[in-house]
Amino acid sequence: MTDKIALTPKTHTTPPAKFSHGVRKGNILQVAGQVGFLPAEEGKPPTPAGPTLREQTLQTLANVRAILEEGGASWEDVMMIRVYLTDVDHFAEMNAIYNEYFEGLVEVPAARTTVYVGLPAGLLIEIDALAVLG
């Protein structure tokens, strides 16, 4: 049986509850929901990248990528991405940012789901991902 490996890149704070930012078991890597927090600074609380959807989306994608890389994966290994938005009016803008970000990706993820949710104050987007390596 393959062990589960918890993934927390140096750029991330320790989660506030009993979970990890990502978990790899065998060739499967699950990235927990990430938000647009800037890289962690010792002794400082998590800080959003900025007030705009663009700033937060790009930082959120960078945070997801950091966990993928920590687990030995890349965007090319991602099978599914879930995007959580706080406002349906952000859908078109998020799609434009998303398409620009993934423009050079050889094979796009097989699926993407967009869900509208409530997030902590000031946060506009959350993204999680499932990758299969190999």
In which residue ranges do the predicted regions lie?
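N-terminal presequence-like segments and the immediate start of the first folded domain
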Residues: 1-62, 66-71, 76-79, 85-134
